[in-house]
Amino acid sequence: NKLNEIPVFVKAGAFVPMIASTNTISSYKGDALKLHYYADSSIDSARGIMYDDDGISMNAIETSAYELFSFEASANKQTLAIDISAKGKGYRSQPAKRKIKIIIHNWSKQPKNIKIDDQTASQFTWNESQNTLSFFVDWLQHPINIKITKHE
């Protein structure tokens, strides 16, 4: 371990949404998101949420001018399923489409297949040295179901 690196401890089954670094709220676009999921064989279900609004409105909660994303995972020996949905009225400047990069940590083998809303994903990256699986989904304001089948 290098002295200039700080270890990060994450709870098994945690969802960690992240955006690119930004200096001010005015430069936040919201059209790109990284969603990290920390898989673990001891976890068969997990949930996470993310709140998003325009960063300006003082009464966004009272007027439901926000999106509240819900992330749910369920796993067994053969599959990992991740569901993404949102509620709230949204806000005027919210993007119509978000590019979400899903990064699954502690993934030890290349998957047999990945289905996004029953469509086989043609592109994904499995990083053997880091034990991560990553791929992109487009969020178009409707629920997304992801099903990853493991090799046996």
Question: What is the meaning of each model-derived region?
Answer:
Residues 117-141:
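Extracellular/luminal ectodomains and secreted, surface-exposed scaffolds of diverse proteins
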Residues 116-117, 146:
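Generic alpha-helical hydrophobic packing signal
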Residues 136-152:
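Surface-exposed interaction regions enriched in Ser/Thr/Asp/Glu
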Residues 1-111, 117-118, 141:
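Catalytic core of carbohydrate-active enzymes
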Residues 83, 103, 134-136, 147:
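Generic structural detector for well-ordered beta-strands
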